[in-house]
Amino acid sequence: MKKHLITGLFAALALTANAQSFKEWLDPEINAVNRAPMHTNYFAYESADAAMQGKKAQSTNYMTLNGTWKFSWVRNADQRPTDFWKVGFNDRGWNNLQVPAVWELNGYGDPIYVNTGYAWRNQFQNNPPEVPTENNHVGSYRREIIVPADWKGKDIIAHFGSVTSNMYLWVNGRYVGYSEDSKLEAEFDLTPYLKPGQTNLIAFQVFRWCDGTYLEDQDFFRYSGVGRDCYLYARNKKRIQDIRITPDLDEAYKNGSLRVTLDLKGSGNVNLELLDAAGKAVATETAKGSGTILMNVENPHKWTAETPYLYTLRATLQGSNEVIPIKVGFRKIELKGDQILVNGQAVLFKGADRHEIDPDGGYVVSPERMIQDIQVMKKFNINAVRTCHYPDDNLWYDLCDQYGLYVVAEANIESHGMGYREKTLAKRTDYAKAHMERNQRNVQRGFNHPSIIFWSLGNEAGFGPNFEACYRWIKNEDSSRAVQYEQAHGNEFTDIDCPMYADYKHMEKYGQRTDAKKPLIQCEYAHAMGNSQGGFKEYWDLIRKYPNLQGGFIWDFVDQSVRWKGKDEIGRAHV
């Protein structure tokens, strides 16, 4: 974890160097300006009782930004308003749009489904990092809010859960920063810009396409806008800035340990309590400042997809009222010989690939829909899910922890439309930083989830030095999990041989190998979109026959349909 002084210095330098240049959206080496460093998925509550209830929307430290915003949409990027962020700007002629919402399902542009090419393929020849100006829709948002007066003296952070494809942010007429990577949250420290207890103007602008779009060529509907919850939250000046947990089991898979790594803003001692599902303390420790401490637990309940038992780690900085709860699952992931083991047992991964998509909301997926997806998976004996092809909403991982699903957590990288060989972005130095940052932020955010057992470097993006560097970084950062990437083709930069659509002959040949050093788990197979997915039994006859064949992930979990009240090619309205 980085020291905050260094992080703040770099952020200040970046802001000075790049402030409001409006060239960021075409520069692959500028993926953020003044964006806060990524941290693990947690929320700091105002009391132990609030922390145990775990309902952050009811916390006094939370303020939603969801709801109605003033909105302006233009078809071409060069038509975008350039002064809308000013406090005195007249937006009375603008429409209203909900946040979160995608534009194309709300009357602004059309939904486009593309598999292997970019959405501009009929009008523009690929030329990274350049993207078209024509048909590069831009949405501009404005909203006035009143920040709670009792937040004065605290740090106030803005959280934008998912914005496609990028965002520029202003507060009270002042430029705050910029962010790319549409499937991970962008957080900004708004403390210098906001006035607690008074009316404040929030304004941001979103482009349909930017240089980062070259890394977001996934096989699904292409939408734009805000896809996840947006909110403000307040933190004490002196606080736990980040907390990482690494559960482990001894060689007999009986007794457990929990390594807790703390990064404090300021100094102080941290009380750590590990509670079982009934709320009984099973281990306590006091950590002295930033650093790592080990908590030992005798014969804990073990976490698996079949037995998803969760403990709660409660972390409290002494002298502060902030309490951070973290769910803990004791489990051990190992690569032994040519098998992956969970708690000493070989697992057959009966997996599915799942896009985060909804027929009504597009990229906006409700908690109810997520729970429905998981319940369907459990009913059909699916025990694993791959997040295709990007990080999902934080809630999805919480639910996988709770219900019991093994997760392959994939970074937001697919450059399929560039091809896999010499033109691949995996070999381009100007996209090296973007590859690395997207993988780093994926790991930094999801580190604490027991359901995540594999990290995935991305999907269908060729292979080259950029992925080699990402693999090395992850293995150094997190030795407790396996790392996979299909385009590594079984070389030393993937712990799993994870091909796509390998046939029976390929599977049997691998199963018969005596020199295999890793398992074969297909990251995609048994293509199931529409009327398909034949020959499934034959795959599983082979998987059950050979121990180094450990399953696969069906492409994909559910058809990507849309209920769109648009018009067909001759102008007839339809749904």
Predicted regions and their residues:
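Hydrophobic h-region of N-terminal signal peptides that target proteins for export
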Residues: F10-N18
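Accessory carbohydrate-binding/adhesion or oligomerization-edge regions at the termini
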Residues: Q20-A119, L201-W209, A277, W540, ...
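Short hydrophobic beta-strand segments in globular cytosolic domains
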Residues: V176-G177, V282, V347
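Surface beta-strand/loop "capping" patches
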Residues: K237-G266
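N-terminal carbohydrate-binding accessory modules
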Residues: R244, R314-M377
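Substrate-binding/catalytic cleft of secreted carbohydrate-active enzymes
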Residues: I374-M377, A384-G571
